[in-house]
């Protein structure tokens, strides 16, 4: 890699819902598309269409009528490697239009990703895509870097899973990481259910996308849920209208904050788990007493499901109620947090000090996939 001064590393953040990919040193990902692979339900139906055996991302989304859709990543963890390979292939060749054998690749992984998975990612990069070098970084750690910190606790909540990850001087503390299987997809489902109770019918995958759009545009988190609920009964101040693709306009009021309230009260959808505030607190309590102060003072939100208005203030209020009374609590919600994992990767892969951290192809050839545990931690 000594001569590779002019070669930009690629950064690929594979989420349950969306793939974020681009070039190290950029301030935002070039390509953002759904993590979906679609295969034709009936082969040879579309005569003369030059039908592909698989479609990825937006194309799969738009042709979903004739396809069977699969999500190769569930709850942040890859569970279907053939489809994952298709997604990476699409990322390199169709979205970024690069030859992966010419660029180092930084991939991201969920916290507590199984060891076998890291090895499989490493193997595919070197053997299928022939990358000259690669690295695997934990998503939450990258978000923390993107916020300009090396110590703090990250609440990373995406489409398929949420994690609370305490990080001290750049290293995640695995014994204190907690996973919550409650994230964006569950909120969309909950909003679909609330709207169905009101007499609107949203059931198909296409309609789910409409509800997701509604959730993203109109939902917010109440500072005081009960009080907001009372206000919404007597006043129309929380009402907003939303135009559906067919031109029909629906008005939603209390649904706007009832939907994401589930993050703080999972019991609303029948889950027994503690909410995101309590999970964050529990994570901090699993850490050494000497570093808790640094964690309470650096609570960083990351991921698309933390994009709701009001989330920072509410989180601050809830954690203040749980923490020791003298503790200084700071919740940081960076405006670009939807992409902060990717941005952190872009920063890391461009650092001159990081250049000796890459796993080189020669090292892989010598040691095999297990090299990833020695070089990426």
UniProtKB/Swiss-Prot annotation:
GO terms for molecular function: ATP binding; hydrolase activity; structural constituent of cytoskeleton. It catalyses: ATP + H2O = ADP + phosphate + H(+). Keywords: Acetylation, ATP-binding, Cytoplasm, Cytoskeleton, Hydrolase, Nucleotide-binding. It is an enzyme of class 3 (hydrolase). GO terms for cellular component: cytoskeleton; mitochondrion; plastid. Transmembrane segments: none annotated. It is found in: Cytoplasm, Cytoskeleton. The keyword ATP-binding applies. Its EC number is 3.6.4.-. Its main location: cytoplasm. Little or no reproductive-gene expression is detected in vegetative organs, such as root, stems, leaves, sepals and petals. PROSITE patterns: ACTINS_1, ACTINS_2, ACTINS_ACT_LIKE. The modification N-acetylalanine is found at residue 2. InterPro entries: Actin (IPR004000), Actin/actin-like_CS (IPR020902), Actin_CS (IPR004001), ATPase_NBD (IPR043129). The keyword Transferase does not apply. Polymerization of globular actin (G-actin) leads to a structural filament (F-actin) in the form of a two-stranded helix. The binding of profilin to monomeric G-actin cause the sequestration of actin into profilactin complexes, and prevents the polymerization. Belongs to the actin family. There are 8 actin genes in A.thaliana. PANTHER family: ACTIN (PTHR11937). Actins are highly conserved proteins that are involved in various types of cell motility and are ubiquitously expressed in all eukaryotic cells. Essential component of cell cytoskeleton; plays an important role in cytoplasmic streaming, cell shape determination, cell division, organelle movement and extension growth. This is considered as one of the reproductive actins. This is Actin-4. It comes from Arabidopsis thaliana (Mouse-ear cress). The gene is ACT4.
């Amino acid at each position: 890699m000594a001569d590779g001064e002019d070669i930009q590393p690629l950064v690929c953040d594979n989420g349950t819902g969306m793939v974020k990919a681009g070039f190290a040193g950029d301030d935002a990902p070039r390509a953002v598309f759904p993590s979906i692979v679609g295969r034709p339900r009936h082969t040879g139906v579309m005569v003369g269409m030059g039908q592909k055996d698989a479609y990825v991302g937006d194309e799969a989304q738009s042709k979903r009528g004739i396809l069977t859709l699969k999500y190769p990543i569930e709850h942040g963890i890859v569970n279907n490697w053939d489809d994952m390979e298709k997604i990476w292939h699409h990322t390199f060749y169709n979205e970024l239009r690069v030859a992966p054998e010419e660029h180092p690749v930084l991939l991201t992984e969920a916290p507590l990703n199984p060891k076998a998975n890291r090895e499989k990612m490493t193997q595919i990069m070197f053997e299928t895509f022939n990358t000259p070098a690669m690295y695997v970084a934990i998503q939450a750690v990258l978000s923390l870097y993107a916020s300009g910190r090396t110590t703090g606790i990250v609440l990373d909540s995406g489409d398929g899973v949420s994690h609370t990850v305490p990080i001290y001087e750049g290293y995640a503390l695995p014994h204190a990481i907690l996973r919550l299987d409650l994230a964006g997809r569950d909120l969309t489902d909950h909003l679909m259910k609330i709207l169905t109770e009101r007499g609107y019918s949203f059931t198909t995958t296409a309609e789910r996308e409409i509800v997701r759009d509604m959730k993203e545009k109109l939902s917010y988190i109440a500072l005081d849920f009960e009080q907001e609920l009372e206000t919404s009964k007597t006043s129309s101040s929380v009402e907003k209208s939303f135009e559906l693709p067919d031109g029909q306009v629906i008005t939603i009021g209390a649904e706007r904050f009832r939907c994401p309230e589930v993050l703080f009260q999972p019991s609303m959808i029948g889950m027994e788990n503690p909410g995101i505030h309590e999970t964050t607190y529990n994570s901090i309590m699993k850490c050494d007493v000497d570093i808790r102060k640094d964690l309470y003072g650096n609570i960083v939100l990351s991921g698309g499901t933390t994009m709701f208005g009001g989330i920072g203030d509410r989180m601050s209020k809830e954690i203040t109620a749980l923490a020791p009374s003298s503790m200084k609590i700071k919740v940081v919600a960076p405006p670009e947090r939807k992409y902060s994992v990717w941005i952190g990767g872009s920063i890391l892969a461009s650092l001159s000090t990081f250049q000796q951290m890459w796993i080189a192809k020669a090292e892989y050839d010598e040691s095999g996939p297990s090299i990833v545990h020695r070089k990426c931690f």
